[in-house]
Amino acid sequence: GSPVFIAFRSSTKKSVQYDDVPEYKDRLNLSENYTLSISNARISDEKRFVCMLVTEDDVFEAPTVVKVFKQPSKPEIVSKAPFLETEQLQKLGDCISRDSYPEGNITWYRNGKVLQPLEGAVVIIFKKQMDPVTQLYTMTSSLEYKTTKADIQTPFTCSITYYGPSGQKTVHSEQAVFDIYYPTEQVTIQVLPPKNAIKEGDNITLKCLGNGNPPPEEFFFYLPGQPEGIRSSNTYTLPNVRRNATGNYKCSLIDKKSLIASTAITVHYLDLSLNPXGELTKQIGDSLPVSCTISAIRNATVVWMKDNIKLRSSPSFSSLQYQDAGNYVCETALQEVEGLKKRESLTLIVEVKPQIKMTKKTDPSGLSKTIICHVEGFPKPAIQWTITGSGSVINQTEESPYINGRYYSKIIISPEENVTLTCAAENQLERTVNSLNVSAISIPEHDEADEISDENREKVNDQAKLIVGIVVGLLLAALVAGVVYWLYMKKSKTASKHVNKDLGNMEENKKLEENNHKTEA
C-alpha cells in the first residue's frame, strides 16, 4: 500500500507532529535526536520503516525493517499414554508450545538423544496454528513410538527451538517416564514355607510368578500324578499335607502352557512306636523287653530319659529291680526340620514283696533298747508289731519317711525279762513276718548295726575307723564274755518277769527252757 507518514519533527521549531494513524495512537515517541520509539509492540509492527530528511535542496531516505519476536511457552508433554506395550506402535504423547512468534520447531528426545523418524518405529507429526487475533503460533508435535524392554525407566523429553532478538534459543520440557508392558518370558514357582522345612500337618502354599509386566494374575497348577491343571490365582494352598504329598509340582501360564515351572517337594515325617507304652506294672525279678522304633524320611536322633534325666543307652531289663521303676520317655527329632519331634512314655511300676530285717540297739544309759524293723516293698507295706506269746499289739511306734520303697518302724522298750518281738509287713502282694529275741534290760547283749538309709547309703565310714572299731570290739568281747555268760545263766533260772511299763502288762513268758532253745539275734 501507499506509505503513511506517522511522525514529523522540525529542526527549527523544535516541535513534534504525529499523524492520525489509529494503529499507532499513543504508541509513538520521536526524540530530539530523531529516534522513533514504538511502545507496546505488536506483530503488526513488523514492517518497513523509512526515515526521511528533507532539506531545501534534496530529500534523503534511510529505510529499516522491524522484526517482532515472542518467546514461546515452555513445552510440555500432554495426552501421555498410560503405558507402552512392546512390539506395538502407539501414540506416546503430544508436545505442545504456545504463543510463539515466529513459529518454532519441536524436537523429541529419548534418554537425551534426538529421536529421528523411523518407519514402523518412530512417527512424528508436526502441526502449527496461528491465533487470528494475536497472530501468535501454537506448535504441536505428536510422537508414535514402538517401545522395547530397553525403554524401562527411560526418560522422554521434547524441546522448542525459536528465534529471538539475540538469535536461536531452545527450551526443554520436563521428563516423562512410561510404564512398559511386556509379555511373560519365564515362569518361576515358589514354595512356602521353605521346602527343606515342610513336615506333616503343615499348610503348603505354591506361588507362581511370571516375569512379564504386568505380571500374570492367573495360572494353572499341576499336582503330582494329575495331568489336568487347577486354575487359580498366583497362589495355591495345600492344607494339612501328609507324606503322600511328596512329589513334583508345576505351574504354567493360562494362555501359554508351554511356559511352565516345576519344583520338588518333600514332606518330612517322623513316626515313633514305644512298646510297651503307657503305665505298666511288673514284679521284681521279671524280665521286660523295651523297644522304641523310629520311622523317618531320614536319620533321626533318639534320646532316652528316665525321670527327666538323660540315659546313656536304651533301657533293658533282664531282671527288674525296684530302682528300675520310673517314668521313661523315648524322644526323637529331625534337627533340620523345626518342630518335627515325637515322644512316647512308659511309666514302669515294679512291685516288691515285703522284705524285713530287724535290728536292736541298747541305749548307752542301759535303761532302754531300740528295736528297728527295716522294711522294703512296693506298694508300701503296712508294719505291725506284736509280742510273741501274748499276741499283744504294740502301737507306740515311730516311722521314717517312705523313700525309694524303703522305710522303718522303731520301738523303744525296757524289758524286765527276755521277750520275742514280731514285725509283720504286708502289702497287696504278700505278708512277711520276722521275729527277734530281746534280752532283759539287765542282760548285756550284742547290738546290731542299724540299716543304712538310702539317702545316706553312699556315705560310708572311713576304713581306718572301721579297723579301729573291730579291734576295740574284740577286746571288749574278751573282757565281758565271762560276765555275760554268768548273768545269762543266772537269769535263766529266774521266774517270769514283766515287760517295761512302756509296753504294759504282758502275759507270762514260756518256760525258761523253751526260751533257751531260741536263737538270739
From Swiss-Prot:
Topological domains, Extracellular: 1-465
Predominant location of this chain? Answer: membrane
Q: List the disulfide bonds.
A: C95-C158, C208-C251, C292-C330, C373-C423
- Looking at the record's lineage, which domain of life comes first? Eukaryota
Provide Cytoplasmic-side residue ranges.
488-521
One CC-aspect GO term? dendrite
In terms of SMART domains, this protein maps to: IG, IGc2
All copies of domain Ig-like C2-type, residue ranges: 183-266, 271-347, 354-439
- Biased composition regions of type Basic and acidic residues, renumbered to the chain: 507-521
Q: Which residues cross the membrane?
A: 466-487
**How does this protein sit in the membrane?**
Single-pass type I membrane protein
Q: Where is the Ig-like V-type domain?
A: 63-172
Annotated Pfam families? C2-set_2, Ig_3
Record's InterPro entries? CD80_C2-set, Ig-like_dom, Ig-like_dom_sf, Ig-like_fold, Ig_sub, Ig_sub2, Surface_Rcpt/Adhesion_Mol
* Modification after translation (UniProt): Glycosylated.
- According to its UniProt record, where is this protein located? Cell membrane; Cell projection, Axon; Cell projection, Dendrite
- Tell me, which GO biological process terms does this entry list? adaptive immune response; axon extension involved in axon guidance; cell adhesion; heterophilic cell-cell adhesion via plasma membrane cell adhesion molecules; neuron projection extension; retinal ganglion cell axon guidance
Glycosites = N29, N33, N105, N203, N244, N299, N395, N418, N437
Region annotated Disordered, chain positions: 500-521
Q: Briefly state the protein's biological role.
A: Cell adhesion molecule that mediates both heterotypic cell-cell contacts via its interaction with CD6, as well as homotypic cell-cell contacts. Promotes T-cell activation and proliferation via its interactions with CD6. Contributes to the formation and maturation of the immunological synapse via its interactions with CD6. Mediates homotypic interactions with cells that express ALCAM. Mediates attachment of dendritic cells onto endothelial cells via homotypic interaction. Inhibits endothelial cell migration and promotes endothelial tube formation via homotypic interactions.
Q: Check the record and name the PANTHER family matching this protein.
A: CD166 ANTIGEN, CELL SURFACE GLYCOPROTEIN MUC18-RELATED
Q: How does it assemble?
A: Homodimer. Interacts (via extracellular domain) with CD6 (via extracellular domain). Homodimerization and interaction with CD6 involve the same region and cannot occur simultaneously. The affinity for CD6 is much higher than the affinity for self-association. Interacts (via glycosylated extracellular domain) with LGALS1 and LGALS3. Interaction with LGALS1 or LGALS3 inhibits interaction with CD6.
The identity of this protein, by name, is: CD166 antigen
